[in-house]
Amino acid sequence: MVANAVHHVSLNVSDVPPAIQFYEALGFREFERPDLGFDGAWMTLNGMGELHLLGFPPPDAVGQHFALQVDDIDAALDELTTKGISPTRTGEIEGICRQAFLRDPSGNEVELNQTL
């Protein structure tokens, strides 16, 4: 078996509505989710793959994150700053990419990645 795409990523979030607002600021859009017997939300980014927010406390994890590709990391950070979102750290892997790391309201880490 060979996978051909990422279908979804699931993240535990301690409070679903603030998590929805955070991911909407990153460009995600919420879509209908069936009743699964617990709080949560399903979101998509430009109709390509899904982010499933699960209404459970996040586990303690070091280094666990997912990355979103951006064309211009400076412009992305400027826009997010106007929405009250600031990076926790930034960096560059020389000749490969520029990175900015954000935390959602539950503490999950999200990387913005600009290929060099």
Short names for language-model regions:
Residues 50, 67, 99-100:
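Short hydrophobic/aromatic beta-strand element in the GNAT-like acyltransferase core
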